[in-house]
């Protein structure tokens, strides 16, 4: 397994090579620590926003999202050890919360991938694990088994917790329009 740091330009080249082979992007966190990378995801994003790839082929099958791995790229933020979701909808990101640099980097990664793969930055194409899990009855709306990126702070916006997919997709659209 490859495990190396890459730039957005290098990611752009990997995405060009995978064009026509990918139609979904799933966003995760590891529920682990900063600097702890996992081969289940194509891309890991560290606390400083660094992008770590685990493959030279983004079309490689990886086991990141239950029953949703074919023709899909899995991206994770290395964070959220000890995170807890509460019944009232509150969240505690644990001892290793997502950083603003991770969130922004994930948005840039999504923008690059969607541009090079010819994908729209919509909730049908770019989905958090929480959003996918809700569709398959194991997310925050049901068992809360998987709630990755269910909510994220909207920074530099108002700083309030908002649906994580909306935060990342919104930033990705901004990056796509403002390179």
PLM regions with names:
Residues 24, 72-74, 125-127:
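Structural preference for beta-strand elements that scaffold enzyme active sites
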């Amino acid at each position: 397994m490859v495990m190396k740091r890459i730039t957005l330009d290098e990611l752009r080249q990997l995405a060009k090579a995978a064009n026509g082979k990918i139609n979904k992007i799933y966003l995760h966190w590891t529920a682990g620590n900063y600097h702890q990378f996992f081969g289940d995801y194509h891309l890991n994003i560290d606390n400083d926003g660094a992008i770590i790839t685990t493959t030279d082929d983004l079309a490689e099958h990886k086991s990141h999202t239950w029953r949703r791995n074919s023709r899909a790229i899995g991206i994770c933020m290395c964070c959220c050890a000890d995170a807890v979701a509460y019944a009232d909808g509150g969240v505690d990101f644990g001892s290793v919360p997502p950083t603003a640099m991770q969130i922004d980097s994930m948005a840039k990664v999504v923008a690059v991938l969607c541009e090079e793969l010819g994908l729209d930055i919509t909730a049908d194409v770019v989905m958090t694990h929480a959003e996918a899990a809700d569709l398959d009855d194991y997310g925050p709306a049901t068992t809360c088994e998987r709630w990755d990126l269910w909510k994220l702070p909207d920074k530099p916006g108002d700083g309030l917790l908002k649906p994580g997919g909306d935060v990342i997709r919104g930033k990705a659209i901004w990056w796509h329009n403002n390179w």
